[in-house]
A protein has these predicted regions:
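Membrane-embedded beta-strands that build the outer-membrane beta-barrel scaffold
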Residues: 1-5, 10-18, 51-59, 67-75, ...
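Composition- and surface-driven signal marking solvent-exposed, interaction-prone regions
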Residues: 11-16, 26-30, 66-70, 84-87, ...
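Solvent-exposed loop/turn elements at secondary-structure boundaries
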Residues: 16, 26-46, 89
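Outer-membrane beta-barrel and related beta-rich outer-membrane complex signature
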Residues: 24-28, 32, 75-100, 190-219, ...
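Flexible, solvent-exposed coil segments and beta strand-coil junctions
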Residues: 28-38, 93-94, 145-153, 231-243, ...
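Conserved small-residue
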Residues: 41, 51, 58-162
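Residues that define the transmembrane beta-barrel architecture of outer-membrane proteins
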Residues: 47-51, 65, 164-168, 250-255
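Extracytoplasmic gating/loop element in the C-terminal half of outer-membrane beta-barrel translocons
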Residues: 188-277, 281-283
Length: 295
């Protein structure tokens, strides 16, 4: 829906959508045979709903000076409604496809893993509190079923989602006579439990620290016991060498900045030039984020 107000000094569009998609193409894990461990299949149902809004305002407009600003906002949610249609355990509810981390009535793209609740410390080792397969400086994870063991089928759970919660951007444009200054702020936000990623996987091999220049990673040492990541080069057999915390990738970025000048036509006519615009521009000049992985 389009709207405008104050003699079109404010205008924009608002859209809400909902849809359902059937027979999605997806690679299903299968028992490995003939070198194949996945097969593409048309399966499942997924619902989508979202909200998008664009609003433009012109706070100031005179002969020599103008200022306009545009705000964009979008939010999308999907939900898996069906996968294979199988209820193997007979509980009256369709089974999740855990091997592919697809869960009924959850968004596609879940972070299904062990839940980190802390870090094992040297004092825990001295007091005999660290279970077999772990060491100080490694992740302490939740024992979901309280059996004293850490197994993939019993102790992993949904701890978040990889898709963003929402996106927004703000673009400002200022014009004074022949000068124009524009800048855009862009942001992707995770909100609660959304837009997660795992930047700490390279810590399993200390060589990666040197090859990828990861010295700024907040990794565990005896002098840094409350670090975000475990000690370098050591991983637990229970969790595997690629396991690392899920960290929100939310950011706010000064994405585009441009300063331009339109050379007056009266000056250009002397050189038989119709139009000339001089400008300088910068991209991704500032980023505010807690994410320390690759962009």
């Amino acid at each position: 829906a389009d709207f405008s107000a104050l003699n079109s000094r404010i205008f924009g569009t608002v859209e809400y959508y909902t849809s359902q998609t059937n027979n999605l193409l997806f690679n299903i894990n299968i028992p490995q045979m003939n070198g194949l461990d996945k097969i593409p299949s048309n399966i499942g149902k997924m619902s989508n709903k979202g909200f998008e809004m664009t609003v433009t305002g012109i706070p100031i407009e005179t002969k020599d000076f103008s200022w306009d600003v545009t705000f964009n906002f979008s939010r999308n949610r999907n939900k898996v409604k069906s996968i294979l249609g199988i209820d193997a355990d007979g509980d009256g509810r369709e089974d999740d496809l855990i091997s592919d981390k697809i869960f009924i009535n959850h968004p596609y793209g879940v972070c299904y893993d062990y839940n980190i609740i802390g870090m094992w410390q040297i004092a825990d080792k001295q007091n005999g509190l660290i279970p077999d397969g772990f060491e100080y400086g490694t992740y302490k994870v939740e024992d979901v079923n309280n059996d004293g063991k850490y197994t993939a089928d019993k102790d992993r759970k949904i701890i978040g989602y990889s898709d963003p919660a929402y996106r927004f951007s703000i673009q400002n444009s200022f014009r004074y006579k022949n000068w124009e200054f524009k800048f855009m702020i862009n942001s992707v936000q995770g909100g609660k439990n959304y837009y997660y990623g795992q930047p700490g996987k390279d810590l399993a091999n200390p060589d990666n620290i040197y090859q990828n220049n990861l010295f700024n990673f907040d990794y565990w040492t005896p002098e840094n016991p409350n670090a975000r990541y475990r000690q370098l080069g050591y991983y637990t057999q229970a969790l595997g060498y690629t396991f690392s915390p899920y960290v929100q990738r939310s950011f706010v970025r000064l994405q585009d900045v441009t300063l331009s000048y339109n050379v007056p036509a009266s000056f250009l006519s002397k050189f038989k030039v119709n139009r000339l615009k001089l400008y300088v521009t910068g991209k991704n000049l500032l980023t505010f984020t807690d994410w320390d992985g690759w962009d």
